[in-house]
Amino acid sequence: MTDSEHSTTGSSRVKRGLAEMLKGGVIMDVVTPEQARIAEDAGAVAVMALERVPADIRAQGGVARMSDPDLIEAIIAEVRIPVMAKARIGHFVEAQVLQALDVDYIDESEVLSPADYVNHIDKWDFTVPFVCGATNLGEALRRIIEGAAMIRSKGEAGTGDVSEATKHIRKITAEIKALTAMSRDELYVAAKELQAPYELVAEIAETGTLPVVLFTAGGVATPADAAMMMQLGADGVFVGSGIFKSGNPERRAAAIVRATTFSDDPSVVAEVSRGLGEAMVGINVADLAAPHRLAERGW
């Protein structure tokens, strides 16, 4: 679909440009207007409004849905930075509601309970840019085809264990690098294996990068975690439970922002890592049974 074909719903150029504005920054999960203010004061480029952080969603179980509109509107009213909110995978009406609430970005999120196990949301139908998760390049490309303006490597949300985030960002960047060395014939085969259009695969092979920004998420809990994600090739970082489940949220939030900005300077990362109090307790991903691995939601 060309930009002119969906000019009434927002072109891909505009949506991707809005996502590009967040590059190099930290996006923080918040569950109250007060937390949103802390995130903004710490230097977050955006906040994700939700009723429960992923650690609580994981601990409490049950069906996790879109947040209450009153909460979302209260957070929007509290801060000047962009506000994101989550919709369930495939739940296009939740996305319609979020767009009506004037959120700045919609995250079609595996952290919430999927509403459709076959179809993701057709994101071309919306003016609001979408964020979508991916564990590998094929998954990322399928979301881009559907209209996603930002990809985040999934990691394993709500654990405080950065190992899955490391695995997913490494896999995506390695698969992109592999495309750049392929011949045209090999790219045709790769496109088939990735279940993506040849034209998109060829574009990535030529540029060596996705056509949208690539953030990372899931388990980032310390300044060093954030800096490592940036050094591994992320354009920015999502931080969920790691801040407001820690001993000193204000200080940790500011430290993670600074470590993200100065990710290539170990002396800065060392300095901001001092005196942060206890990090979130966390869960080892290796101890999670397959049904409890949120990153496996989506296809």
Curated annotation (Swiss-Prot):
The keyword Lyase applies. Pfam families: SOR_SNZ. D-glyceraldehyde 3-phosphate binds at R170. CDD domains: pdxS. PROSITE patterns: PDXS_SNZ_1, PDXS_SNZ_2. PANTHER family: PYRIDOXAL 5'-PHOSPHATE SYNTHASE SUBUNIT SNZ1-RELATED. In the presence of PdxT, forms a dodecamer of heterodimers. Belongs to the PdxS/SNZ family. This is Pyridoxal 5'-phosphate synthase subunit PdxS. It comes from Leifsonia xyli subsp. xyli (strain CTCB07). The gene is pdxS.
